Each structure stands twice: as C-alpha cells, then as structure tokens.
UniProtKB/Swiss-Prot annotation:
Disulfide bonds join 50-104, 63-115, 81-130. Belongs to the pancreatic ribonuclease family. It is found in: Cytoplasmic vesicle, Secretory vesicle lumen; Secreted; Nucleus, Nucleolus. Keywords: Angiogenesis, Cytoplasmic vesicle, Developmental protein, Differentiation, Disulfide bond, DNA-binding, Endonuclease, Hydrolase, Metal-binding, Nuclease, Nucleus, Protein synthesis inhibitor, Pyrrolidone carboxylic acid, Secreted, Signal, Zinc. This is Angiogenin-3. InterPro entries: RNaseA, RNaseA-like_dom_sf, RNaseA_AS, RNaseA_domain. The active site is at residues 37, 137. One of its GO terms (cellular component) is nucleolus. It is an enzyme of class 3 (hydrolase). Zn(2+) binds at residues 65, 106. The modification Pyrrolidone carboxylic acid is found at residue 25.
Amino acid sequence: MVMSPGSLLLVFLLSLDVIPPTLAQDNYRYIKFLTQHYDAKPTGRDYRYCESMMKKRKLTSPCKEVNTFIHDTKNNIKAICGENGRPYGVNFRISNSRFQVTTCTHKGGSPRPPCQYNAFKDFRYIVIACEDGWPVHFDESFISP
C-alpha cells in the first residue's frame, strides 16, 4: 500500500502532538545559546582562540561586536536555571558560582570578515535568561566585579 503525500503529511502532523517539544535537541533557542556561548574545553583563550571560534561558530557575518564563551559543562550551565542560580532583574538569573569565561571583542574597523578580536579571560558570575528550564540568552552587559 502506497501512501499519498497528503496522507504522509497528516501522519507527520499528528505525530507532532505526541512528541514533547521541550526536549533539548528540539529547543532551537537552547541550541543557538550553546552554539554562541558554550565551549567546555577551550584551547589558547587568546585572540587566535577568539578569531577561530567566532569564525567556526559563524558569528562573523557581520562581525559580532562582543561574544562570551562559557567554559564548563552543559549541566552546570543549565543548573543556573534551577538550583545554581537565583532571579536577577526581570527575566534573568544570575549564577551562584563563578564560571570560567572568555569574552571576545571585535577590534573595530570593517564589520565584514576577516574579523579581528581581542580576548579577555575571566572567572565570574554569569547572567542568563531561561525558558522552560533551559538557558536561551547570555547577558553580555553584565560583568561582575
């Protein structure tokens, strides 16, 4: 028995209601957060690291002005949305512990590649926005003392 394209579409649409959309692999905003800000095992953490990572993560078209990479496990970062974080401002959470981070700052000039970056290594509290218990946004404006 051959199913028509319309029947296949109907079966697919019905199956969407059965599979929970909150799974991490289906959470587009969480995946985007990881792509932009997660690097568990960095190497170098200097300007070459920034230029390489920004290019690899496709954050250079145009050159992104500032981006921070968090160097820890996904579980520890996710825990900020729960027991390892507390409310901060209106829609954010601040970590209860410090995280190793590298902040890459565009040196200026043309917003088009090749992009050149400075690197700033730090160990600080971080502020993120969470959605349904998943990190979805990193607050670049917060830098702890």
